[in-house]
Amino acid sequence: MRTENCLVELGTEELPPKALKSLGEAFATQFEAALSQADLSFDSVSWFAAPRRLAVYVSGLAEGQADKVVEKRGPAVSAAFDADGNPTKAAQGWARGNGIDVADAERLVTDKGEWLLHKAHVPGQSVAELLEGLINQAVSKLPIPKPMRWGNYNTQFIRPVHTLCVLYGSEVVNVSVLGLTSGRVVQGHRFHGEGRFELDHADNYASALEQQYVLADFEARKDKVRQQLEDAAKNLSLKPDYDEELLEEIASLVEWPVVLQAGFDKGFLEVPKEALIYTMKDDQKYVPLLDSDGALSNTFLFVTNIESHDASQVISGNEKVIRPRLADAEFFFNSDKKTTLESRLESLETVLFQKQLGTLKEKSERISALSAFIASQIDANETQAARAGLLAKTDLMSNMVMEFPDVQGVMGKYYALNDGEDAPVAEALYEQYMPRFAGDALPSSGVSASVALADKLDTLVGIFGIGQLPKGDKDPFALRRAAIGVLRIVTELSLPLDLETLVSKAIDVYGNKLTNAETQTQVVDFVLGRFNALLQDQAIAIDVIQAVAARRPTKPSDYLARVHAVDKFKALEEAEALAAANKRVANILAKQNVEVTATVNIDESLLAEDAEKALYVELKAAQKEVEIAVPSQDYTRILTTLATLRNVIDNFFDNVMVMADDEAVKHNRLALLSLLRQLFLTTADISILAKS
């Protein structure tokens, strides 16, 4: 069957830059799914996205569906003919519906009986017949939260659509989508080139647009922006300050990226660089430049959509745009410094944290008390932690943060230093929100860690305490992020903290505000659940996690040590047999209602068989090793020691009848198994590793 490459392009008005990439990806995903559902064969589907277009390109698309033979089963032969062998009404009706005579029907014989059968030849539809429905299906499934109407059309899309190009090879496929009839017209650059032009072949889409000053390939355009930024910064011996999010947003704003450099008055550098950077990156999509020491330069880069004949005018225009924004930041900074953070505490009384949980001032007081407690647990300065916790939210009332919300915490640090607060206190105001995202830095001191943990725990306990648990994708108080933050701080900084203790203290600090009696258990379980998800993301096997989770250790560092130990144990040659033995032991003890406890009494005088005597000796030796290793959380040592018991355990089960007739002997042997089980449970429930 003939194949050609196919292009579908929607020519639009400027698309929302933050949604452009996801729209392009979704268009390709949905169109590919539609092609597959229609049984149209193809090699691959790729996508293009630029500010004024969305397109999909299908390589090796078949010109139509393959013909099919569809088997249509009729009534059973016993019901298809009467006693004289004449077709019944059921058989005649079925045959008529399929356009055949009963005599022409074939027979389908199975072990359940015999039926009439018609094999219908169904010719496949051509790609020209199918494309309209497939395109409309894909477009209707794009992630568009707020579609809009335009002109006199009843159709809706994220932005008005003005051109529709659908080519199968060099042929136009006539379809109607979003009120437009397809053709071969494509929009070039708004200012360069010919404007609209006709595309001769699907294969020439990207190259023809490039001649018209449009880079339609999103990733290629992003790479070009990146390279120009790096080259321009290198020429200035500076480093561009951007991340992938900013880069993608810039690439979504331009069709033909051209990087230029501009500058601002050096006097603005007296303002904290974070505020200036926020203004440049978030408000204007400019790229700040840093020197080798990380200091901000008064030169910056910006990306335009044109190759200007007079670049100086474009540069001057952008400098005029940024100047008043920087002047605002300078004014806010200087005016804010006239008021101390401590004097802003009372104004926090006017801001609600949550209706049932009180104001931000009350939250600050709780954070202060909890920070001091945590500091006492990790040998940090309690006085500084309490002070930092009290001032943690005061910068929210400053003019700078009200204007530029993303600099909260950062400005708290600068204002605290201006007020003469201790350096660790100031740093804690900045680091209280860490980690803000996956891979973000962690608090750098015990004081900062105490405040960061206190803030997150106060939110977790408070929201759970009034019964507003996160459901599905809804997590308005970012409790999942808070839980992950707690876990990262405690584990990566190796802090000796117990979730039960932390949550209990946070509940106490709330006084009588909380109404959920299950808060303690629910918060600890929620955080541990996030821990399990994090560990799965790190490629830890689910059964390893479940084995540790069964013991419910609530010290995150202890939990992690157990997981790593079980993960190593699972790779040992003895692991499978020992897991199976643990499962067998657990089942025996459960059936006999024997509870595994820390203290197990075994009567040596009742040990009659050599195999049970040998097991007892080995278990007592292993018990001593376990007792030595537990305080240092050396679970790898524990499991390595217990792994040496494999042969003696196998020998016991091969030669000893646990359920002896003598009740005393039976209970003694059950006690022996209880000790074995207890030693393994010191680390995890190894029986969970046993294969079903």
From Swiss-Prot:
Annotated organism of origin: Alteromonas mediterranea (strain DSM 17117 / CIP 110805 / LMG 28347 / Deep ecotype)
Alphabetic keyword roster: Aminoacyl-tRNA synthetase, ATP-binding, Cytoplasm, Ligase, Nucleotide-binding, Protein biosynthesis
PROSITE patterns the UniProt entry points to: AA_TRNA_LIGASE_II_GLYAB
Cellular component annotations (GO), alphabetically ordered: cytosol
Tree of life domain: Bacteria
The protein's name in its UniProt record: Glycine--tRNA ligase beta subunit
Family matches, as Pfam families: DALR_1 (PF05746), tRNA_synt_2f (PF02092)
Protein localization: Cytoplasm
GO biological process, one term: glycyl-tRNA aminoacylation
Assembly description: Tetramer of two alpha and two beta subunits.
Taxonomy of the source species: Bacteria, Pseudomonadati, Pseudomonadota, Gammaproteobacteria, Alteromonadales
Keyword Ligase on entry: yes
Enzyme class: ligase
This enzyme's EC code(s): 6.1.1.14
PANTHER family membership: GLYCINE--TRNA LIGASE, CHLOROPLASTIC_MITOCHONDRIAL 2, GLYCYL-TRNA SYNTHETASE
Cited SUPFAM superfamilies: Anticodon-binding domain of a subclass of class I aminoacyl-tRNA synthetases, HD-domain/PDEase-like
Family: Belongs to the class-II aminoacyl-tRNA synthetase family.
Main location: cytoplasm
MF GO annotations: arginine-tRNA ligase activity; ATP binding; glycine-tRNA ligase activity
Catalytic activity field: tRNA(Gly) + glycine + ATP = glycyl-tRNA(Gly) + AMP + diphosphate
